[in-house]
């Protein structure tokens, strides 16, 4: 067993005595050794270790990517009632990661995670409600779950709320409420919120602040979002926006910018 800074647990009693600092110390240690340690704890039955190991297998952190093994560990954690495992099992079923896509099962896992208080579960369940994917479409219920997640500080949910007010879906159209929600999402680090907040700032003549937020978008945005945002910015009436849009497009991988 490779060296890790935290002694290897031998049984459930040892697992129960691990502190949050112990977990963080292992996570921050040498990736390969951390994977070995985490797998041992997962095999002892730790739902936390099962969820972390699943994520590492999904990402290829310290080990080869293996979506099927990742899914199996997420499912083990989920069946123990562990909310992170439930949410990730839902993501696997939604996105066909290591298993066949099944939006109905995904919605069930998200719903359980949401009812247990996980903000990411609330957000993912709301997304399915909004899209009518795996559940009957219900924007009112979707907005309710976005609000619950936003109350917990979930930035992506704040941005979603902004769109509801911007478009006037199940709530009266309210640009001030949309502006506030996009601002909350932007300050929370959501790149979509930053992009939309920048647009509304520009509409209000606050160009310097708009540009400052817009420059943050490429730092966290996915390549596909940078493509969409860059193309949109090239159509802007503001020269500075067009410049940032071109910079976004120039930074894309060649296969995405063809």
Stretches found by the model and what they are:
Residues 30, 43-46, 59-61, 66, ...:
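Short helix-capping/linker turns of helical repeat alpha-solenoids
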Residues 49, 85, 121, 157, ...:
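TPR alpha-solenoid repeat register
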Residues 98, 134, 170, 206-207, ...:
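Alpha-helical linker/edge segments of TPR/alpha-solenoid repeat scaffolds
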């Amino acid at each position: 067993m490779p060296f890790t800074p935290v002694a290897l647990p031998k049984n459930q009693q040892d697992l129960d005595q691990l502190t949050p600092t112990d977990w963080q110390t292992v996570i921050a240690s040498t990736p390969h050794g951390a994977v070995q340690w985490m797998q041992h704890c997962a095999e002892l039955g730790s739902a936390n270790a099962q969820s972390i190991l699943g994520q590492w297998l999904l990402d290829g952190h310290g080990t080869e990517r293996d979506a099927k093994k990742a899914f199996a560990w997420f499912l083990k954690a989920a069946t123990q009632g562990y909310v992170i495992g439930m949410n990730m099992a839902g993501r696997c079923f939604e996105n066909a990661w290591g298993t066949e896509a099944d939006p109905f099962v995904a919605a069930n896992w998200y719903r359980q995670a949401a009812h247990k208080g996980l903000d990411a579960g609330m957000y993912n369940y709301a997304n399915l409600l909004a899209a009518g994917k795996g559940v009957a479409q219900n924007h009112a219920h979707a907005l309710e779950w976005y609000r619950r997640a936003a109350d917990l500080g979930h930035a992506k949910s704040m941005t979603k709320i902004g769109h509801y007010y911007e478009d006037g879906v199940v709530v009266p159209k309210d640009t001030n409420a949309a502006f506030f929600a996009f601002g909350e999402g932007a300050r929370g680090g959501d790149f979509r919120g930053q992009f939309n907040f920048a647009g509304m700032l520009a509409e209000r003549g606050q160009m310097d602040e708009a540009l400052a937020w817009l420059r943050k978008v490429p730092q966290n945005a996915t390549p596909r979002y940078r493509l969409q945002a860059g193309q949109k910015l090239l159509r802007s009436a503001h020269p500075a926006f067009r410049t940032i849009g071109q910079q976004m497009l120039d930074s894309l991988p060649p296969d995405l910018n063809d």
